[in-house]
């Protein structure tokens, strides 16, 4: 990072990293500047977490300084919600703590779940969203989901696989399933507020 701002807040160290457009970024397997910036932030977070000996929560990479406050708020909300996920890696991304943040009352988490998880799932269409919702509501049973939706179990597998590929969250994984379940609930609540 070409710019760095460090601040101490209570027993927390806040670090905001900045990058100029002319900074050399090494090639990576990920495409796009955001993926590369996220890799650099992850590397820095690993070093900071290791040297400080405490928990590290990484806010999302944002396009500019005008959005840095949002990233910082996400990271601070993640730090407050971190005790809710005992198995969280260190460092952990604030967006990976969205369910805990939402339960802790973080309104920004609700917006982010709608944008990052629910919107892509909803855009896939009702068969995919209802398959995920039914699968999670029935405790992860492929057969019960297939019976409930009047489709073959392979159709359920296919739909869940497509959701995993397109949305990035796998309903068959307990942690990802929690994220998807929260996204479906938040999406339903958003629709009911609009009605």
Regions of interest found by a model, annotated:
Residues 1-195:
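Cytosolic nucleotide-utilizing catalytic cores of signal-transduction proteins
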């Amino acid at each position: 990072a070409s710019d760095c701002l460090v601040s101490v807040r209570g027993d927390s160290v806040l670090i905001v990293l900045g990058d100029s457009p002319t900074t050399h970024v090494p090639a990576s397997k990920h495409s796009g500047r955001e993926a590369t910036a996220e890799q650099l932030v992850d590397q820095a977070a690993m070093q900071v977490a290791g040297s400080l000996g405490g928990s590290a929560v990484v806010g999302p990479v944002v396009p500019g300084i005008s959005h840095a406050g949002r990233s910082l708020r996400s990271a601070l909300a993640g730090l407050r919600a971190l005790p809710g996920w005992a198995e969280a890696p260190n460092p952990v991304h604030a967006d990976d703590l969205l369910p805990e943040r939402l339960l802790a009352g973080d309104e920004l988490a609700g917006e982010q779940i709608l944008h990052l998880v629910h919107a892509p799932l909803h855009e896939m269409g009702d068969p995919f969203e209802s398959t995920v919702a039914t699968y999670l509501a029935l405790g992860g049973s492929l057969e019960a989901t297939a019976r409930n939706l009047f489709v073959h179990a392979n159709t359920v597998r296919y739909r869940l696989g497509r959701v995993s590929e397109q949305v990035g969250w796998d309903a068959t994984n307990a942690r990802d399933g929690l994220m998807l379940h929260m996204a479906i609930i938040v999406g339903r609540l958003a629709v009911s507020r609009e009605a």
